[in-house]
């Protein structure tokens, strides 16, 4: 939010001496992601294999995800995971992102609290989603995968993965929830600009999509439907894997670069947060900013 008001010359002079944006140099981009599961005294219960009803193993995920990503997903022992140099090189295009002191918001609220926000919108695609998209595309490329699939709702994740797929020379198929496909043509254009094939979901290109359209011809789509189509395509296409933009542990792992940078920037500001707040959908944004701070508790 932006707040505007009048001020006097003395206030302007006072403002000129205060720092609003705390910027880290490229050399301070973290070299490791933080895996909070390793530090949890009570480990999360493992998901169950839907076929065997037994605890899921990393190898159960290999047919769907790149092996390195499946291993990260199930890793509950290593607190720190190295960030490959090729990923850090891509991060340098927009990281470290600024930490900003929200003086105007503090004034508008009349609060004595010091409010800071981590501005992930400076990434080439305008969101934090690129932090994991770059990592996932890299690990797929390293495994020799040539094609990847995904779903997207409003298009933020699809745009991020399109950028990353282009950077690492991968072919990408995106199933975009139909209502968003129709309402957000510019987001679709961004994906197509980076070379992605974008299909409105449900579609006639998969069994899952055809079944839904047969039963509900006017259905406007959902993330669940788009996921079903993306996984089906990945499973039926040679040398192809599925990627996901939130919810899973390895996605949140990649997003911890946000909080790790913010820690250093708060030190630059000479403060430490009492409360960390983040928007929460699938959880990768909130986990990314909060997990590095939570490890100290």
Task: Map each language-model feature to its residues.
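PLP-dependent amino-acid enzyme catalytic core
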Residues: 11-297
């Amino acid at each position: 939010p932006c707040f505007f008001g009048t001020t006097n010359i003395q206030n302007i002079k006072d403002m000129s001496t205060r720092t609003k944006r705390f910027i880290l140099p490229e050399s301070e981009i973290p070299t490791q992601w933080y895996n909070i599961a390793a530090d949890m005294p009570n480990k999360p219960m493992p998901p169950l294999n839907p076929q065997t009803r037994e605890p899921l193993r990393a190898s159960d995920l290999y047919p769907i995800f790149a092996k390195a990503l499946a291993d990260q997903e199930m890793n509950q022992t290593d607190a720190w995971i190295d960030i490959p140099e090729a990923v850090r090189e891509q991060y340098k295009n927009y990281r470290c992102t600024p930490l900003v002191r929200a003086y105007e918001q503090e004034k508008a609220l009349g609060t004595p609290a010091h409010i800071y926000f981590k501005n992930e919108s400076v990434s080439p695609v305008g969101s934090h989603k690129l932090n994991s998209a770059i990592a996932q595309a890299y690990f797929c490329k390293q495994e020799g995968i040539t094609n990847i699939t995904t779903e997207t709702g409003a298009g933020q994740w699809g745009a991020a993965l399109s950028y990353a797929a282009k950077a690492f020379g991968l072919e990408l198929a995106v199933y975009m929830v139909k209502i968003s496909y129709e309402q957000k043509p510019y987001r679709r254009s961004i994906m197509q600009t980076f070379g992605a094939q974008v299909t409105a979901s449900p579609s006639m290109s998969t069994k899952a999509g055809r079944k839904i359209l047969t039963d509900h011809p006017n259905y406007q789509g959902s993330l669940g439907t788009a996921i079903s189509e993306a996984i089906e395509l990945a499973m039926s296409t040679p040398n192809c894997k599925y990627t996901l933009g939130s919810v899973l542990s390895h996605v949140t792992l990649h997003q911890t670069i946000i909080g790790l940078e913010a820690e250093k920037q708060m030190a630059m500001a000479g403060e430490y947060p009492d409360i960390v707040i983040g928007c929460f959908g699938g959880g990768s944004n909130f986990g990314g900013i909060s997990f590095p701070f939570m490890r100290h508790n």
